Amino acid sequence: MENDLICLGVITSSHGISGHVKIKTFTENPEDFTSYGTLTDGINTYEVEIISIISQNIIIAQIKGIVSRTDADLLRNKKFFVEKNKLPNPTNDDEFYYSDLIGLNVVLENNNVYGNIKKIHNFGSCDIIEIRLSNSKKSTMLPFTKDIFPYVNVKEKYIIITLPEVIGNNSDIQR
């Protein structure tokens, strides 16, 4: 996927019998999901209309041309993207897009480089930062919280990490 595309959401399931889909949105406000025009999966484009907002990050939507549950079921796990230049620019230093974090150096409070950000995941409960450790081919994953990552500087390409207390073997962690 090109770096200039930002994922706005993913279809989690069909909804009903008339081709509606349930979409998990990654926008700050669910109603913004369709505010940026036509969406793409990287190959095809889609016109999406919000039917209802279920929760802070779940919407029911109709996709143009999808008219049956069978059609909708075929789209399960499809991700929708928009060109980054169609999105508003962050207005504060503490605002950023998650895609801007990929590749940033992860720096300990003593200024030693711990690694760099490989990927950001969300397995349901919270966002997880995957870090490729320096001096190793290993990766580690930590929850993306203010306690663990108190400072992000996208312009200077680094993020500060305060390592949490670890239960069990922490021999891979170099402080």
Swiss-Prot record:
Locations listed in the record: Cytoplasm
Sequence similarity: Belongs to the RimM family.
Any GO BP annotation: ribosomal small subunit biogenesis
Gene3D superfamilies noted in UniProt: PRC-barrel domain, RimM
Function as written in the Swiss-Prot or TrEMBL entry: An accessory protein needed during the final step in the assembly of 30S ribosomal subunit, possibly for assembly of the head region. Essential for efficient processing of 16S rRNA. May be needed both before and after RbfA during the maturation of 16S rRNA. It has affinity for free ribosomal 30S subunits but not for 70S ribosomes.
Domain PRC barrel: 93-167
rRNA processing in keyword set: yes
Oligomer status and interactors: Binds ribosomal protein uS19.
GO-annotated molecular function: ribosome binding
Record's keyword terms, sorted: Chaperone, Cytoplasm, Ribosome biogenesis, rRNA processing
Pfam families in the record: PRC_RimM, RimM
UniProt domain comment: The PRC barrel domain binds ribosomal protein uS19.
GO CC terms, sorted: cytoplasm; ribosome
Intrachain S-S bonds: none
Entry superkingdom: Bacteria
Lineage, top ranks: Bacteria, Pseudomonadati, Pseudomonadota, Alphaproteobacteria, Rickettsiales
The species this protein was found in: Ehrlichia chaffeensis (strain ATCC CRL-10679 / Arkansas)
Protein name: Ribosome maturation factor RimM
